[in-house]
Structures are given as structure tokens and as C-alpha cells.
């Protein structure tokens, strides 16, 4: 299950294995508290990338979507490496 969540959220760890284990545990706890299935997270990730991609040229390989949770709230945190901002004519309508 951890491998699936890591792939869906494009999680990349660094540092000591203990730190990586803590990050994975936090991710699993946040996932459980948010009650989101891996399929739903994957769909959300794809849709978010599509919307952001309308306005920004982003590095999708380095994009991270993380769930973080504390005792009161769960947050979806997105990190998008921006290559450039796409310029659109003001009259162009969004899809």
C-alpha cells in the first residue's frame, strides 16, 4: 500500500531511513483521516495538474502532492516546480 501511495503522490524522500519512515507514517495517517482512496487521490492529482497546466508550464516529474495531518486538520499540499508562466490573451476563454 505504501508503494501505491508513494507513486500516486509522487513522494520522494531524502535523508535517514528513520526520517523517511516517519514521513511515510504521517502520510498514511493523513490518508486514513481524510478517508480518500488511492484512486480518488490519483484522479485529484491528474485534475489539479491539468488546471495548473493551463496557466503554468510545470515540471510534472518533480511535482509533489502530499497529505499532511495534525490533530485537528488534514491538508493537501502541492509543490509545483514552475518552468515558466504561460501568457494568454485576455479575450481567450477557458475550457
Swiss-Prot record:
Q: Which UniProt keywords apply?
A: Cell cycle, Cell division
The UniProt record lists the keyword Hydrolase: no
Would the keyword Cell division turn up in this protein's UniProt record?
A: yes
Protein's organism: Microcystis aeruginosa (strain NIES-843 / IAM M-2473)
Q: Name one Pfam family in it.
A: MinE
Q: Where is the signal peptide?
A: none
GO terms, biological process: cell division; regulation of division septum assembly
**InterPro entries given in the database record:** MinE (IPR005527), MinE_sf (IPR036707)
Gene name as annotated? minE
- Under which name does UniProt file this protein? Cell division topological specificity factor
Summarizing the function annotation, the protein's role is: Prevents the cell division inhibition by proteins MinC and MinD at internal division sites while permitting inhibition at polar sites. This ensures cell division at the proper site by restricting the formation of a division septum at the midpoint of the long axis of the cell.
Q: Which protein family is it in?
A: Belongs to the MinE family.
Amino acid at each position: 500500500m505504501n508503494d501505491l501511495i508513494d507513486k500516486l503522490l509522487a513522494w520522494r524522500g531524502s535523508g535517514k531511513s528513520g526520517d523517511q519512515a516517519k514521513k511515510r507514517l504521517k502520510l498514511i495517517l493523513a490518508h486514513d483521516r481524510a478517508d480518500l482512496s488511492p484512486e480518488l487521490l490519483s484522479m485529484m492529482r491528474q485534475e489539479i495538474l491539468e488546471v495548473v497546466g493551463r496557466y503554468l508550464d510545470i515540471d510534472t516529474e518533480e511535482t509533489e502532492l502530499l497529505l499532511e495531518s495534525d490533530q485537528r486538520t488534514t491538508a493537501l499540499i502541492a509543490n509545483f516546480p514552475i518552468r515558466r508562466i504561460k501568457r494568454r490573451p485576455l479575450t481567450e476563454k477557458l475550457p
